[in-house]
Amino acid sequence: MKIVGDSEHFKQPYDSDEEYVSKTEDKRDCEAAQKVGMELVSLSKTQLDKIELDEHLYDSIQQAHKIKPKTEAYRRHMQYIGKLMRHVDVEPIKAALAVVLNKNSNETAKLQIFEKMRERLLSQGDSEIQTLVEHYPQLDRQKLRTLVRQATKELAKGPESKSSKELFKYLRSEIQD
């Protein structure tokens, strides 16, 4: 008769399995995949086209755009997208999503810089034109003066100014960092 030690007696079949994933960890992974799916649904079609996705997943995301949010059908569809995301490698999608979202924030930051330049030009006039032309020699001083003068006149009449928009477009097209 062989005596079995306590450790052998209470040993479970999964104790030696190195690839064992607990239910809690599996649920966390599923929820993370569903959150990535929700982020994908929030993207526009052009942004979504920049991310390489499985055809079935892409079609499901497009269908989610057609369903009204805050409905039971939308919630079920989001769970379905989460289910599809579990069968796809999520890491490359997360990386592509970060690139798309970061590119948008970089574009917004650039536009804000041009907006501030325009505001300084309109408030300070010739001194700011001189500073900008020294900093960016590709700018045409005469064109800047004309646009600033017209925009200042139009802003005195009303808040929306065609020349102010032209000044913004000119700065954006000429200054490319």
Curated annotation (Swiss-Prot):
InterPro entries associated with the record: DarP, DarP_sf
One Pfam family, short name: DarP
Main location group: cytoplasm
Claim: Iron is one of the keywords in the record: no
BP terms from Gene Ontology: assembly of large subunit precursor of preribosome
Compartments (UniProt record): Cytoplasm
Gene Ontology cellular-component terms listed: cytosol
Keywords, alphabetical: Cytoplasm, Ribosome biogenesis, RNA-binding, rRNA-binding
Gene Ontology MF terms in the entry: ribosome binding; rRNA binding
Region entry Disordered, spans: 1-26
Signal peptide: none
CDD domains assigned to the protein according to its UniProt record, in alphabetical order: YjgA-like
PANTHER family: UPF0307 PROTEIN YJGA
Family: Belongs to the DarP family.
NCBIfam families per record: PRK05255.1-1
Its job: Member of a network of 50S ribosomal subunit biogenesis factors which assembles along the 30S-50S interface, preventing incorrect 23S rRNA structures from forming. Promotes peptidyl transferase center (PTC) maturation.
Name by which UniProt lists this protein: Dual-action ribosomal maturation protein DarP
Native organism: Shewanella sp. (strain MR-4)
Source taxonomy: Bacteria, Pseudomonadati, Pseudomonadota, Gammaproteobacteria, Alteromonadales
